[in-house]
Design a protein with these regions (language model features):
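Metallocofactor- and cofactor-centric catalytic cores in central/energy metabolism, strongly enriched
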Residues: 1-409, 416-496
Length: 496
């Protein structure tokens, strides 16, 4: 096994593939590098002498500037590397993409559930969605009392509780409404019970204005203040929905019907070498096959945004991307926060130093696909290909945002590990094999095999097939097996 890797020929750093001791050496591009310090796996090593203020390159792009003189063979991290990110920027459109059908996977297909609106889901579940947090406990009780009706083609009955829906104003409330509307229309739901209280800001009559047209057979409403026994009536409505969903059958569908969300969390120094490029290959293959992928966590585009902007289909999409980036920077600044204050303690422990470094690894999940659309929070994905979605870096908030925009599953890469799940199957892809082995009950796929010189193309083919099997219901995500069905909504406003 190699001791270190230079990701791009222009990089001024290498990444340690195993723990290395001071005084040990390794070869990179014909030169012998002698370590000046102990360096843990996933962390960076200087490949040349670097002067104060000089840009440090990884992935072929700057990840920050040197704080001090750094000698060849030295450990590089927060003590000698700083972010170079600015605030609001003026961007220029420099198109750098090409339509490439060479990746097309002919006849790629899966078995899914086609809904009345034409969309295709990969699960057939009954969802109970409160309009307001006041009825969360009632929703949970209805879920528990309805489990007797889970059978046959029904994959599960779940309530999705949240604390919002009242004491919200303006755009903050509209964000909640759009998010909940996205879930209610989701193709993974064979039926939905919308549970209201009656006096909330987001009461059912007001919410229906945002919800728009809906399938009256599959979406039912119940106001708890309007009935004597809300539990009995709620369970009866769920029973009716289950009777309908039992008749649903999987059918053969083209991979072009898939909408897949992309997310990373607990990233480490290997995420941008293994797991994220593997997901990028998946994204290229699915979009070439006519499918759709959604990329969010906008703060983790900072420092790599120009790469995405250069892949925008046209000037209109470019302008939307600029607005997406600068609006999120303004959101940080409005609260007096630095835009580069992102890498978490876990990220840093795993070898990531700056937000630029994190972002350059993060955007690899989108492969080389053309950016076809930019979506506001809660807006459904309707354009095939790669779309950028407004959302934060927070794992649960971002994953739920992907689901609300129509993602039927989320591919979640991680170097540290996390057990959570959102309303759709949340597949965890480990960046390193030790994590996959230690947390086999969390991790669905081991991308760390690439560090052991596994063929990238072979693993990419295997992973594409793996995702299609998950979509067909032949494999359940570990998050599903652990019964992790969590919900979190992005909030930006006052609470009355």
């Amino acid at each position: 096994m190699k001791q270190a890797i230079q990701i791009h020929p222009n990089d001024t750093v290498a990444v340690a593939l195993t723990d290395l001791n001071r005084g040990s050496s390794f070869m990179i591009d014909g030169q012998n590098i002698i370590l000046c310090d102990d360096v843990k796996a996933g962390h960076k090593i200087a490949l040349k002498d670097i002067n104060p203020g000089e840009r440090i390159l990884k992935y072929g792009y700057p990840i920050g500037t040197a704080k001090v003189h750094i000698s060849k063979g030295s450990f590089i991290h927060s003590h000698n590397l700083r972010s170079s990110l600015g605030e609001l920027l003026d961007y220029r459109y420099h198109p750098d993409f090409q339509d490439d059908c060479s990746l097309k996977a002919p006849n790629a297909s899966f078995y899914g559930y086609r809904r009345s609106d034409g969309r295709v889901g990969i699960r057939n579940e009954i969802w109970i969605i409160p309009t307001v947090g006041c009825v969360n406990a009632i929703a949970k009780e209805i879920e528990q009392q309805s489990q007797q009706y889970k059978k046959g083609e029904i994959d599960g009955i779940y309530s999705y509780n949240h604390p919002y829906g009242c004491s919200q104003l303006g755009e903050d409330q509209r964000m909640t409404q759009k998010f909940l509307s996205g879930l209610i229309h989701h193709p993974n739901a064979g039926g939905v019970l919308v549970l209201g209280l009656g006096c909330e800001n987001n009461n059912i009559p007001e919410f229906k204005k945002v919800l728009g047209a809906y399938d009256e057979n599959r979406i039912r409403f119940l106001n708890c203040q309007d009935c004597k026994d809300e539990l009995a009536e709620g369970v009866a409505l769920v029973k009716e929905l289950c009777e309908l969903a039992l008749k649903d059958k999987r059918e053969l569908c083209s991979a072009r019907e898939l909408i897949v969300g992309l997310k990373c969390g607990g990233s480490d120094g290997f995420s941008g070498i293994t797991a994220n490029p593997l997901i990028g290959a998946f994204s290229d293959r699915l979009t070439a096959d006519g499918g759709s992928v959604l990329l969010t966590e906008v703060p983790e585009m900072f420092g790599a945004e120009q790469l995405l902007m250069n892949r925008c289909r046209n000037k209109t999409i470019f302008n939307k991307t600029v607005k997406l980036i600068n609006d999120f920077k303004s959101y940080f600044m409005r609260y007096g926060e630095r835009i580069d204050e992102n890498p978490s303690p876990g990220n840093k422990a795993g070898g990531i130093t700056t937000l630029e470094e994190k972002s350059l690894g993060c955007v690899q999940k989108a492969g080389t696909a053309i950016v076809e659309d930019v979506l506001s929070y809660g807006k459904p994905a309707t354009v095939k290909g790669l779309s950028l979605l407004q959302g934060p870096g927070n794992d649960l908030v971002a994953s739920c945002a992907l689901a609300a925009s129509g993602a039927v599953m989320v591919l979640f890469t991680t170097g540290r590990g996390t057990p959570f799940g959102c309303p759709v199957p949340t597949l965890k892809i480990a960046s390193n094999t030790p994590l996959a082995q230690k947390k086999s009950h969390w991790i669905d796929y081991d991308a760390g095999q690439l560090l052991n010189e596994q063929s990238f193309d072979i693993l990419a083919d295997d992973f594409y097939d793996f995702v299609l099997r998950v979509a067909s219901g032949k494999i359940n995500a570990k998050s599903e097996r652990l019964d992790k069905h969590d919900l979190s909504i992005f909030k930006d406003g006052v609470t009355l």
